[in-house]
């Protein structure tokens, strides 16, 4: 019998905490589900989302953020890429605003049901996600 281990996003974020430092952007932060895990490891924490909500510091389109080049030491984006229309542009944008030597931590679904929020456009394999970011930066 073949068994597949599913790793949930919280476990991935826990693992990623070793890379979180400095000025940190939570891109597509929504309800900031992981803020309590992320923020203690940062110098500053900024949450950005397309929808205004408590705790969201910047409201805007993650395809073209208002930040200058090399603004963040860490960029975190969890379960957002499947909802954007052009994930390749988001990946390019992440590289643009990440500082040299910084870290980009991304999670994206592969096997998950349709969940429009407001759209549900893509699924990513490990190889596909790696290719997306390799080509972007």
Range-by-range predicted roles:
Residues 1-3, 116-119:
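Active-site rim elements
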Residues 1-18:
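Class I SAM-dependent methyltransferase Rossmann-like catalytic core
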Residues 3-7, 85, 123:
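Conserved phosphate-coordination/catalytic loops
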Residues 131-137:
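Substrate-binding/catalytic lobe of Class I Rossmann-like enzymes that use SAM or dcSAM, i.e.
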């Amino acid at each position: 019998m073949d068994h597949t281990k599913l790793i949930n996003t919280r476990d991935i974020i826990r693992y990623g905490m070793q890379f979180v430092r400095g000025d940190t952007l939570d891109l597509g932060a929504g309800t900031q589900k992981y803020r309590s895990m992320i923020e203690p490891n940062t110098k500053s924490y900024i949450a950005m989302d397309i929808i205004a909500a408590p705790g969201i510091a910047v409201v805007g389109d993650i395809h073209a953020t208002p930040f200058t080049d090399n603004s963040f030491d860490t960029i975190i984006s969890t379960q957002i890429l499947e909802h954007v229309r052009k994930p390749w542009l988001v990946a390019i944008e992440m590289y643009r605003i990440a500082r040299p030597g910084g870290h980009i931590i991304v999670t994206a679904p592969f096997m998950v049901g349709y969940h429009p929020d407001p759209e549900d456009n893509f699924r990513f394999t490990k190889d596909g996600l790696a290719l997306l970011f390799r080509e972007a930066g």
